[in-house]
A protein has these predicted regions:
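Sensory/regulatory domains in signal-transduction proteins
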Residues: 34-149
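Eukaryote-specific, low-hydrophobicity, charge-rich regions
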Residues: 1-53, 71
Length: 149
């Protein structure tokens, strides 16, 4: 988890030019993971697949709260099941940009928790998470200023 947290933060900075956290992404120990875990915006990762449904592999506490799930049950949730029709269309239209440029800003929208409750967000950011070999590891999403509606 510590390695994934470091990859998430480093990849965000590489692609957007901005820091995701207040702590250096190369910081020792679990400082990066702790800040990522307690980040106020929902941050989650899923597999990089367009032909299959992308399955979630990680979420911070805000992400688990937004999805109304646990880390254990997270792997049973698919990206296309939480996005509404408009969100799926936007993601599909931006997917090649995410893969080529490394990230994309997505407009405000709605999604749904695993319990079926509607969730609104002001903006979302999607970016490629690269491992230490600069290979694609997963896709990360940050849902900014989300709330149940």
């Amino acid at each position: 988890a510590i390695t994934l947290a470091r990859w998430i933060c480093r990849s965000y900075k590489v692609h957007t030019g901005r820091e995701l956290l207040q702590v250096d992404s190369q910081a020792a120990g679990d400082a990066v993971l702790k800040q990522l875990w307690h980040h106020t915006d929902s941050i989650m990762c899923c597999s990089v697949k367009m032909n299959d449904s992308a399955v979630f592999s990680f979420a911070n506490q805000a992400g688990l709260d937004m999805l109304e799930t646990t880390l254990l049950a997270l792997q049973d949730i698919m990206l296309d099941k939480i996005l509404d029709e408009a969100g799926r269309k936007v993601l599909l239209s931006e997917f090649s940009k995410i893969m080529q440029q490394g990230f994309a800003y997505l407009p405000a929208g709605l999604c749904v928790s695993s319990m079926g409750r509607p969730v609104s967000y002001e903006q979302a950011v999607a970016w490629k998470v690269l491992n230490d070999d600069n290979s694609n590891h997963c896709l990360a999403f940050m849902f900014i200023n989300w709330s149940f509606v």
